[in-house]
Amino acid sequence: MNMGHFKFVIVNLVNQKGREKRVGGELDRVVLRTNLDFVRLNAFDFHKECRTLDWGRLDMLKKQLRSEITEFGFFSSFINSTEHMHKQKGFFRTNCMDCLDRTNVAQSMLAKESLKDQLSYMKIIGNGFEVDSYPELSATFKRIWADNGDECSRQYAGTGALKADYTRFGKRTFSGAWNDCINAFTRYFRNNFADGYRQVTLNISRLCAIF
């Protein structure tokens, strides 16, 4: 399999014990079996590392991926021109169990690092500065990302995203944790008492589309 100059890093955020360990182990097995030199698996037990609302430990994940964030770069091109200034050289594929809440938090971190590199390249922010060094820019980024995460979550699970206080404010809060409890209960209710009807409707719609 030839992927040219592209590389992939799979960021696996599932628990490394309990029922999720089996899923993570299967992913490990598949990656090892395929033995592709342009694919790397980076396991990070999100719930273990960030327990007790200590989400500053996400810096560990950032350090694990920082060299590849730089290596993969970003795409940039002149307006009305086919000339490219930069070509992206790789991708991050992030997953948890449903690729929603933990995934959204990790991807927001990756996106912020990439945004920093792009703005630094364009000399909009200085070298060595972080996006959070500019309060208005940081607030806008967090709001856009959190709103997008909430919308994706509503389509998939019927509620806003869990852990949204981190993506929206950059830290975990007790009000955010309480809101997570409400959303988790709402998801449980929908999953057991409402989503069955929706799934049947989708199945019928797909069947009609086939015929």
What is each residue range found by the language model?
Residues 1-85, 112:
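Cysteine-based protein phosphatase catalytic domain of the PTP/DSP
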Residues 90-109:
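A phosphate-binding catalytic loop at a beta-strand-loop-alpha-helix junction
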Residues 10, 104-109, 115-117:
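Classical protein tyrosine phosphatase
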